[in-house]
Regions:
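Flexible, solvent-exposed loop/hinge segments and secondary-structure transition points
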Residues: 2-208
Length: 208
């Protein structure tokens, strides 16, 4: 009996030791990868802003954060990157907007000119189904079936199935609705952005 108790104690100690060592290794690996992952996200955002504003040489002149409630009363946060060209002329803004897609959160970056017209968009993060909802990165671009470029969402953009004029992604109506909601919300946040001249966020140059 004592031998059995001793064996169990040793087993517990060994398993505990292994768990501690593995936990330390995972923590170390996470520490090593945090920096590169953060740098990758920063670069993706910088490239995304250039893409959606359709300008390769620009700077973010001001960063604003807008909080608005959705239809269910949930508070949503939007980040607005006010942009200028190399000569200091205002171009409009790129807006980060997140909604729930079919497979998880759908984070969209939408570029607007000063009047609120859509210049471009890109997906920063998504968990949509490859070959279906994931097509959102191309489907709504200029010249594509669901083209929204050049539109102003003062009247919310909706899919044709809901009485709107935007063709939904084939077999991916949920993703299409989520995407358009993200764009509509981004527009509303853009229009609600403070117009003060004072900078409220970091200013940085973005060159090709």
């Amino acid at each position: 009996m004592k031998k059995l108790e001793s064996s169990l104690t040793n087993m517990v100690l060994v398993l505990t030791g292994v768990a501690v060592v593995m936990g330390g290794i995972l923590a170390y690996v996470n520490h090593l990868t945090e920096g590169p992952i953060a740098e990758q996200k920063t670069k993706a955002l910088a490239d995304g802003i250039k893409t959606v504003m359709c300008v390769s040489d620009l700077k973010v002149s001001r960063t604003d954060t807008v909080h608005q409630n959705d239809a269910k009363g949930k508070e949503l946060t939007y980040i607005i990157y006010q942009t200028q060209d190399a000569q200091g002329q205002d171009l409009g803004a790129a807006v980060e907007s997140v909604t729930g897609g079919f497979g998880g959160d759908l984070k969209v970056l939408v570029g607007f000119d000063a009047e609120g017209k859509i210049l471009g968009y890109t997906l920063l993060e998504h968990a949509e189904t490859p070959g279906l909802g994931a097509k959102a990165d191309k489907w709504f671009q200029k010249g594509e079936k669901g083209d929204i470029i050049g539109k102003t969402p003062s009247d919310p953009l909706t899919v044709s199935k809901d009485g709107g004029q935007v063709d939904a992604i084939t077999a991916s109506t949920i993703t299409s609705r989520a995407f358009l909601l993200a764009v509509n919300n981004a527009y509303n946040a853009f229009k609600a952005t403070p117009t003060a001249d004072a900078e409220t966020g970091a200013t940085k140059q973005m060159k090709k």
